[in-house]
Amino acid sequence: MGYYSLTEVTAVQYAKEHGYFEKKANVVCHEIGDGNLNYVFKLDDGEKSIIIKQALPYAKVVGESWPLSIKRATIESKALQIFAKYVPEYVPVVYSHDEELAVTVIEDLSRLTITRKGLIDGEEYPLLSQHIGHFLANVLFYTSDFGLQSEEKRVLEGTFVNPDLCKITEDLVFTDPFGHYDTNDYEPELQLTIDELWSDKTLKLKVAQYKYKFLTRKEALIHGDLHTGSIFSSPSETKVIDPEFATYGPFGFDIGQLIANLLLNALSREEEQRGVLFFHIEKTWSYFVETFTKLWIGEGVEAYTKEKQWLPIILQNIFTDAVGFAGCELIRRTIGLAHVADLDEITNKETRIQAKKQALSLGKELIKYESKNADIQLFRTLFQQTVSGGIKA
């Protein structure tokens, strides 16, 4: 029959045909996805529920003028299964994957809240940083040359060649926000700030280097789009979802993207409400370092993991990359395609424009920052300097 797009009616038919519900079951189906690339349906018969996710052959956020390969659904399914191999507690269960229809049937996580929405609403997730730090350390270590035999790593790397979605990252994170491109989207009040950004040759040279790292450093399997909208949370649970951008890339990429999105939420808050965001930024890194170090010592398979001075160099390189990638993400989410609700839903226009100018300023400082001795306090320091007016956009 070939590929066809599901509807709420045909999603139920599909689920029944594949044994997820009895033929006579009264199944309620709703499309619940608010993402940019896929259909997501929730199906519930009153006793059990599932999620059906289908990749579209184009970017939903733009339309059929932006075609995309549906093979990304297979990438996502395989990534979730790789993640589950190392940290099953932090990902949804994958029940099945249909490559022809680009359909994945997965665990329903509606008991949890999308972390971005929860943070905007002021909810607190005390275990978020611990869980994400552990998730990142395990996945990045075990899919790298340090935790995986080189032959196995090369084979796995070939499984995650993801040209369509990597091209989106190349363009929307590293290229378009730094010049005159049609994909950019911003308020006229930001134009002067943006003109200064685009004319900053030192900044562009640094962005070029981070883009090159993304293109060439195949260090570990990365989620590729790890923001607070790609995480479900509750006070006791954390689940990472939507790894359709998964590919082999730099260790620091996912870390930087996550930190940037926590910073964006911090910019949307009053000063006295920001502490929890910096707690999560700093604890994510400390849990990552702690777990990665334990794995390096106990599970390292590469010969030079026995050299005591090698690990500190690796960790410093990861941190340096995370700083720059965070800066790129801050700018992209402010003036590029696919904004974040943290800033866009600030109701007072003057406050919203000010927060966006601060996001651009902070992003620029993170990209241009150069120090081999910086630690995780850097984010708090530069943030405070930015919002207090010590750094101008």
Swiss-Prot record:
Top-rank taxon, per record: Bacteria
EC category name: transferase
Binding positions for substrate per the UniProt entry: 225, 332
Gene Ontology MF terms in the entry: ATP binding; S-methyl-5-thioribose kinase activity
Reactions the enzyme catalyzes: 5-(methylsulfanyl)-D-ribose + ATP = 5-(methylsulfanyl)-alpha-D-ribose 1-phosphate + ADP + H(+)
EC number: 2.7.1.100
Chain positions recorded as ATP binding sites: 38, 53, 107-109, 242-244
Family assignment from sequence similarity: Belongs to the methylthioribose kinase family.
The protein's name: Methylthioribose kinase
Organism the protein comes from: Bacillus cereus (strain AH820)
